[in-house]
C-alpha cells in the first residue's frame, strides 16, 4: 500500500501566479501540486493536495490525514499561519510529522508575519525558497520518516 502525504494550502494560495508576483513569483498552484506529486513519487509516496480559503476546512483536512494514516503533512497556512490556534491544535492533536512551508520569506516582510502558530507544531519550517520550498519539505519529510529516493 502506498503511503500518502497531505499537502495543504491555505487562503489565497489559489491566486499563485497572479497575486503579487514580485513576492510570490509566477508559478501557479497547479505547478506546486505537480511538483509535490512528482517529488513524492520519487520516494514511493502519494501527495494528496488540497487548497482552501476556510480555516475550519484546513482543520478537517488535518483530521482526515490522521484518519487515513497519512505519513506526513506539508502545510502552507497562508495568513492563518499567523493567527490560527485551531490549526496549531489540530496538528498537535494528530501527531503527524509536519513541515510548514511559505513561498516568500515571511521574516523579511511585515512584522505580523514573523509569528507562526503552525511553526510551533511543525518539526521544520521552510520559507523564501519559492515553490522549491515544497520540494525541499518533501525531501525533509521523507528523511524524517525513514524513506530514501527510489532510483
Curated annotation (Swiss-Prot):
GO terms for biological process: amino acid biosynthetic process; aromatic amino acid family biosynthetic process; chorismate biosynthetic process; quinate catabolic process. Pathway: Metabolic intermediate biosynthesis; chorismate biosynthesis; chorismate from D-erythrose 4-phosphate and phosphoenolpyruvate: step 3/7. It catalyses: 3-dehydroquinate = 3-dehydroshikimate + H2O. Keywords: Amino-acid biosynthesis, Aromatic amino acid biosynthesis, Lyase. The active site is at residues 24, 102. Signal peptide: none annotated. Pfam families: DHquinase_II. The keyword Lyase applies. GO terms for molecular function: 3-dehydroquinate dehydratase activity. Its EC number is 4.2.1.10. Gene3D superfamilies: Dehydroquinase, class II. Substrate binds at residues 76, 82, 89, 103-104, 113. It is an enzyme of class 4 (lyase). Coiled coil: none annotated. InterPro entries: DHquinase_II, DHquinase_II_CS, DHquinase_II_sf. The record marks 19 as: Transition state stabilizer. The keyword Nucleus does not apply. Homododecamer. Catalyzes a trans-dehydration via an enolate intermediate. Belongs to the type-II 3-dehydroquinase family. HAMAP family: AroQ. This is 3-dehydroquinate dehydratase. It comes from Afipia carboxidovorans (strain ATCC 49405 / DSM 1227 / KCTC 32145 / OM5).
Amino acid at each position: 500500500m502506498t503511503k500518502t502525504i497531505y499537502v495543504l494550502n491555505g487562503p489565497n494560495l489559489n491566486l499563485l501566479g497572479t497575486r503579487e508576483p514580485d513576492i510570490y513569483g509566477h508559478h501557479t498552484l497547479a505547478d506546486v501540486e505537480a511538483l509535490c506529486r512528482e517529488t513524492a513519487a520519487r520516494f514511493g509516496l502519494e501527495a494528496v493536495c488540497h487548497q482552501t480559503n476556510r480555516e475550519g476546512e484546513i482543520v478537517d483536512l488535518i483530521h482526515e490525514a490522521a484518519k487515513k494514516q497519512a505519513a506526513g503533512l506539508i502545510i502552507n497556512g497562508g495568513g492563518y499561519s499567523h493567527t490560527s490556534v485551531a490549526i496549531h491544535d489540530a496538528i498537535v492533536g494528530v501527531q503527524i510529522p509536519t513541515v510548514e512551508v511559505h513561498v516568500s520569506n515571511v521574516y523579511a516582510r511585515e512584522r505580523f508575519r514573523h509569528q507562526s502558530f503552525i511553526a510551533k507544531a511543525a518539526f521544520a519550517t521552510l520559507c523564501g525558497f519559492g515553490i522549491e520550498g515544497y520540494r525541499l519539505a518533501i525531501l525533509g519529510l521523507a528523511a524524517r520518516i525513514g524513506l530514501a529516493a527510489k532510483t
